[in-house]
Each structure stands twice: as structure tokens, then as C-alpha cells.
A protein has these predicted regions:
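Substrate-binding cleft of secreted/luminal carbohydrate-active enzymes
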Residues: 2-27, 33, 47-48, 260-355, ...
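N-terminal carbohydrate-binding/catalytic regions of secreted carbohydrate-active enzymes
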Residues: 16-129, 293-295, 306-309
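Alpha-helical scaffolding within the catalytic cores
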Residues: 25-33, 84-96, 120-127, 188-201, ...
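Aromatic- and acid-rich polysaccharide-binding/catalytic face
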Residues: 41-52, 196-239, 304-309
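Glycoside hydrolase catalytic-domain groove-lining segments
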Residues: 66-67, 74-81, 214-273
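Active-site groove signature of glycoside hydrolases
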Residues: 126-156, 179-186, 264
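Aromatic-lined carbohydrate-recognition surfaces of secreted/lumenal glycan-active proteins
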Residues: 168-194, 257-272, 298-308
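Aromatic-rich peripheral "rim/lid" segments of glycoside hydrolase catalytic domains that contact
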Residues: 293-297, 302-412, 445-491
Length: 491
């Protein structure tokens, strides 16, 4: 038995889960589909508390006229963020944030915000986010465009200055939050970033640099169809998009004199444009380029998204029942890529004792302590499960076995791991020792100080780390042949 440490992948993968184009899908379902955790799950919300229509969702506001586009509304058509002034911390997005963290992943939160809000409003948002560990926050993304509603309310300089103010507030009141600036990207025609002078100070203030770039996109959805008679869509060269993203980072390093992580916060191809098979092939080409590139320049990208009302998802929403998804060809391709070493967190031996009981630290999906146990198999088993006694029953646990991940919720007594062997490629070909690892993310999805209100408590280690004790190991039950061989004949 050893103590191990979960560390970053060469390129992390995040998953978009819910936006204006689709509902949130719970993490149990996604884990069952993917058989592996992501680094983070991306949520998208909007916040315009000064508007008279607030908090009505934009698509439900009666404007007295027919909508002409996806963003033809008073504010963006994401679900409303109900924290902040309202202080509703038990509903969206907080219930989903807790679900994400319980399942061993970090929260990646996008907020489009009224750029005329004051510092005191942002302080309220910062306090909302303090209990959620190492959280990534993207504010007013694609800010050099003209489609989002906030760009119609302020100048680009005002938008840039607003982002700098939000960074300053978050760093002071929620230091666990890292700020993502998703702004203009490199342009081949100029050799510069779009609006790089206006957003220079914002780039310097951000913790993480980002861009959004689709390999193909039908931006006319849902108001028109891709056809020879319409023009609201495009398909791009995968190689050119790759170069654009990479050159964006190089240009940012040059103009800021800084070096920060680079991510792509929205990436996919749109099945509406050239069909689902081309969608899958284009994304595979991009992911192959990343793995062949020795510079390892991209820290992470977010696949947008898991289930989509259009054709931007691994699943498309069943039009008869929004709780059901229809799997697309891209899911199988992406799942194979997700399990590759390049996109997987590394699990390495950690310092410190592993004697039981042991206290394990959960910092996040790229920094967490676990316990590793060797398991011997002579052949493919017919039964492989873990059982949890009364001491272990309350624990919230993520379990890793040979690259596959399983979740144990508080109160669950037994976890069946046999599904790993249902994949023909995972059959035991010769006797060997396999590694089983246990990690303990927060049971309620939140970090809390030993005493006091997490929204108001003093800064400390609790902002970044959650600790839980593993008193003993689960019982491992393995059967390599059927227990019952005798046939009982009916009388």
C-alpha cells in the first residue's frame, strides 16, 4: 500500500455541461459514459441584476417581436445566476458545482455580467465562490466580438477595464479563484491579436489566457438551417485553427512579457455543418496535432459540450424528452482520446506515510492525495467489487482502476468494478498485479474552515484543500470462476 499524488496531464480536458443550447447532465451519467473523469466541468450562466426583467431567463422575456438570432434578447440566454444580490446559494449553479466537486473534478464557471456593475456587486460574487476550492472563472468571454449582449452596453475599453476590476476583486476576496480572459486571438493578416491594445491590461491581469475557436460552426442555429440558401455557417481548416491558437499564446507572451497557461475554453466541430462523421474526424485531427506537437503549449481545452440541443454535442438532446441524449459518433472517438496518457492526469508516488488510518488531502483534480493498493489477477474475473463497512459508509470516494474511474457516494455499500472487464481489450491476458486507487473529494462538494462561515471566514489552507480520513480499506471481492457450478434440475 502506497500514498499517491494526482498530478496534471500534459493537456487537460474539460467538458462543457449545460449552456443556452442544452441542460446540465449529472456527473454520474457522464462518468458512466466516459469511464473517466475530466479535469473540470464547464458551466455557463448570466448575471444582470439591475435589469427590470431579472431574473427571468432571456428566452422567456416577451420583447413584443420575433427573435432574429440566438443573442437577440435583453441579456444572454444562459440560465440566470441566482447568487450575488439574491443570495440563493442552494439552487443553480451551486447544486451543480457541488455535484462536480463530489465527483472529483474542478468547476469551470463562465459568467456573462452586466459590465456596469460596481465593485460591491462583484464582492458578493466572490464570496459565493469561496467554498468551491480551485475554481476557474471566465467572465464576459469572446469579448472582442459583437454578438453578446454585454458588448452592446459598453465600449470595448469599458469591457476590458471591467475585467481588470473583477480580477482585482476575485484575487482579494476569493483567492481560490483563477481568472480566465477569453479575448481576441491571433490574426494572420496583421500578426497581432484582435484588439490587443485595448485588452492588454486585461491580459496582464488574468491568471489564464484563453480563446474560443470552433472547427466548424452553424451560428444561425436555431433560427435557420445549413443549406445552399443560407450563409450563417462555416467550416475551417483544422491546421489553420491549430496555428491560430498556438500563435495566440506566442503573441500574448511577447506583448505582456508574461507566461501563463493557455486554454481553449470552447472547442468542437458542428455536426450541423458537414455531418456527424466529419465532426468527429475534425476533432480527432486537432487532438492528434496536440499529441504530436513537442512544444506542449496548450494547458487544456473544453469540449463544448456533452449534450446539445443542436449538433454541437457528444449527445444531441432527444426532441421528445430532454432528459435523454442521442449518442453521436464523436463520443466514441473522444472517449478513446480521453483515456490516452497525454490527456490523463498522472498518478505518482507521494511522500508521507500510508499507515491506516490515513488523512488524505484533496486539492483538486490535478493535486490530490490517494492510497494505492495492489490487486492480483490470474485471469479475467467473473466478479470484482468493493464493499464498505460502517466506518467507510459515510465517505465520498473516487476510485481509479487501470485508467477507469468509479464513484462511491456517501451511504453506498457496494461498488461493482466488473464493467472494466466488459471491454474486450481489458481482458486479462496473463497473470499480473494491477493498481487500485482511492481518493476522497469533499462529500458535500464544498471546502469549509474548521470553524465559522465559509463565505466570511478568514483565508487559509481550507480555501484550497479539503481533508478526510480513510480509517481502513474497503473489502475487495474477486471471483475468477463462477461460485455456483452445479446445475439444480427442476422437479
Amino acid at each position: 500500500m502506497n500514498k499517491v499524488l494526482l498530478t496534471p496531464a500534459k493537456c487537460a480536458l474539460d467538458m462543457g455541461d449545460g449552456s443556452e443550447r442544452g441542460l446540465y447532465v449529472n456527473q454520474d451519467y457522464i462518468l458512466q459514459k466516459m469511464k473517466k473523469v475530466h479535469r473540470g466541468i464547464s458551466l455557463m450562466y448570466t448575471y444582470y441584476p439591475n435589469d427590470k426583467e431579472w431574473p427571468t431567463r432571456a428566452c422567456q422575456i416577451d420583447t413584443g417581436r420575433e427573435s432574429t438570432g440566438a443573442w437577440d434578447s435583453p441579456y444572454e440566454n444562459y440560465f440566470p445566476y441566482r447568487g450575488g444580490r439574491e443570495g440563493l446559494r442552494d439552487g443553480e449553479p451551486f447544486n451543480f458545482m457541488k455535484d462536480i466537486r463530489r465527483h472529483g473534478m474542478d468547476v469551470v464557471l463562465t459568467l456573462t455580467i452586466d459590465p456596469h456593475l460596481k465593485e460591491e456587486d462583484i464582492i458578493l460574487l466572490a464570496k459565493d465562490l469561496r467554498p468551491y476550492g480551485r475554481l476557474l472563472l471566465r467572465v464576459n468571454h469572446e469579448c472582442t466580438g459583437d454578438w453578446f449582449c454585454y458588448t452592446k452596453r459598453a465600449s470595448y475599453q469599458e469591457i476590458a477595464d471591467f475585467f481588470v476590476m473583477v480580477c482585482r476583486v476575485m484575487h482579494k476576496y476569493a483567492p481560490n479563484v483563477k481568472m480566465i480572459l477569453c479575448a481576441g486571438m491571433w490574426q494572420k493578416s496583421t500578426g497581432k491579436l484582435e484588439m490587443e491594445d485595448i485588452f492588454l491590461e486585461a491580459h496582464k491581469a488574468a491568471d489564464i489566457w484563453s480563446g474560443d475557436n470552433y472547427l466548424s460552426l452553424h451560428w444561425g442555429w436555431p433560427n435557420d438551417h445549413v443549406s445552399k440558401e443560407t450563409a450563417n455557417y462555416a467550416r475551417y481548416s483544422v491546421a489553420e485553427v491549430y496555428e491560430k491558437a498556438k500563435m495566440t499564446l506566442k503573441r500574448l507572451r511577447k506583448i505582456t512579457g508574461q507566461d501563463k497557461p493557455m486554454v481553449l475554453s470552447e472547442l468542437n466541430a458542428d455536426g450541423d455543418v458537414a455531418g456527424p462523421y466529419v465532426q468527429s474526424n475534425m476533432m480527432k485531427q486537432f487532438m492528434d496535432l496536440l499529441q504530436k506537437d513537442k512544444e506542449n503549449w496548450l494547458s487544456a481545452f473544453t469540449f463544448y459540450q456533452f449534450r446539445d440541443d443542436g449538433r454541437l454535442g457528444m449527445e444531441i438532446t432527444d426532441p421528445n424528452n430532454s432528459e435523454i441524449g442521442i449518442e453521436q459518433p464523436i463520443m466514441n472517438m473522444y472517449k478513446k482520446q480521453l483515456h490516452k496518457a497525454f490527456f490523463s492526469q498522472k498518478i505518482i508516488k507521494a511522500e508521507g506515510g500510508s499507515e491506516l488510518p490515513v488523512t488524505l488531502r484533496w486539492g483538486g483534480s490535478e493535486d490530490a492525495e490517494g492510497i494505492e493498493v495492489p490487486v492480483k489477477f490470474n485471469r479475467t474475473p467473473v466478479l470484482f467489487e468493493l464493499t464498505f463497512n460502517d466506518k467507510l459508509l459515510p465517505l465520498n470516494m473516487m476510485i481509479e482502476f487501470n485508467g477507469w474511474w468509479f464513484y462511491k457516494a456517501p451511504g453506498t455499500k457496494c461498488i461493482d468494478l466488473m464493467s472494466y472487464f466488459y471491454e474486450k481489450s481489458n481482458a486479462i491476458k496473463k497473470p499480473g498485479i494491477f493498481k487500485l486507487r482511492y481518493f476522497l473529494p469533499p462529500a458535500d462538494g464544498m471546502n469549509k474552515p474548521k470553524t465559522g462561515d465559509p463565505y466570511e471566514a478568514k483565508d487559509g489552507d481550507w480555501l484550497y484543500n479539503y481533508y478526510a480520513e480513510l480509517p481502513e480499506l474497503p473489502e475487495i471481492r474477486i471471483e475468477e470462476s463462477p461460485v455456483c457450478r452445479r446445475i439444480t434440475h427442476l422437479k
